[in-house]
Amino acid sequence: MIIDEFLARYLIKLRTGKFDVQMKLSRLLFSMLFSAVLFGCTDTGIKTNRKIQRIHNDLFTVDAHSASAINFLYKKNFDPARLNDFGSFDYPRMEQGGLDACFFAIFPGKNIKGESNIDITFKRIEKTVDAIANSIADNPDIVEAALHPDDGYRIVKEGRKAIYMGVESGFAINSVEMVKEYFDMGIRYMTLCLNINSLLCDSSTDPKGAEHNGVSQLGMDVIEEMNRLGMMVDVSNVSDKSFNDILEHSKAPVIVSHSACRALCSNHRNISDEMLLRLKGNGGVVNITLLSQLLKSPGIDNNSVQQKLSDLKEKYKDLIKADPARYGDEYNIERERIVKESGQNASVADLVDHIEHVIQVIGIDYVGISSDFDGGGGVDGCKDVTEIENITRELILRGYSRSEIKKIWGGNFMRVFREVAKVAERN
């Protein structure tokens, strides 16, 4: 039954020309042979699940972008060391799902320019970092803070989980000197903008359009400092012109911490095939994320769904500003309900479609995975961190080898992280 479902899925893709036929036929043959061994072991499927679990547990799995850091600061009852009945992440669920390393992308809050807001943003990030650090200090047998790419592998070998930190949005910074302050806090990547233009660069989604015609001079200086220190430059959310400027200026490979492929889902936040080719030339990595709106374009009921989502955003806009913890969760739950009822929610299969598209365009060495859990991330088959093994299962079903899955699940991301550190060492 499982093999029939797998074959049907692939025959559809081959007929529609969605993927390269020769490459897919070879993978299909491998998958049929692999599946025959894997699924022929037992009628109950117990051995099948054990084999997949063994492969999954053998990986070094990295979530390149988790928004769950917001819970450390805003959720009063959040204890990451215990199993919580809200959110998508905690340490017990991290263990259950087999996630080895997580990059907490610290969301700085309201995107408003100005000196006072930068000060507020800095303090908010500082408080979040302190909250995460305190949690790690309270649970040394479970987790450890990681700063260097090699730290993660060491920590996991010792039987614990590795916690890295990044900052989402260039609104966290208004001077080159601040880069060092964030680096000293333990921040190892920074996204240069979010949904509107920052002081550093233009966003892909600012309704006012471009402000800097790409990257500003301050943005260029910040990139140089990030390269010097060994902080990864995250080009998620940036405009196409900003993307090109960053790749031209950066001496180190860059990351796309959470995005997907524009060829499969038309969204300004996704990256085009041309951008993928430039990313390959830079040696960077794109991490395909579990955000339905980036993985799957709305269908026939597009206008109706989009109107409902637009109305919802307007309803919660001021409420979230006043109480991001309470109303942010309410908004995400309501948004997920609208998407689910519309039949537009993406699945693990959609996620892997985007991974395969990257592989087809630029090869298997430039793609990774991120969740954006507690920031809107979560698809059918992978709603929280306990279900990430389903991604491994889907990759196995599609014929990817253990070594290939290792690259996708963290190897490629850590390669870039290591190269960024080497560039800093040479400076």
For the regions a language model picked out, list residue spans one by one.
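N-terminal hydrophobic targeting/anchoring segments and the immediately downstream early-domain regions
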Residues: C41-N213, S266-N427
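Sec-dependent signal peptide recognition
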Residues: K24-S31
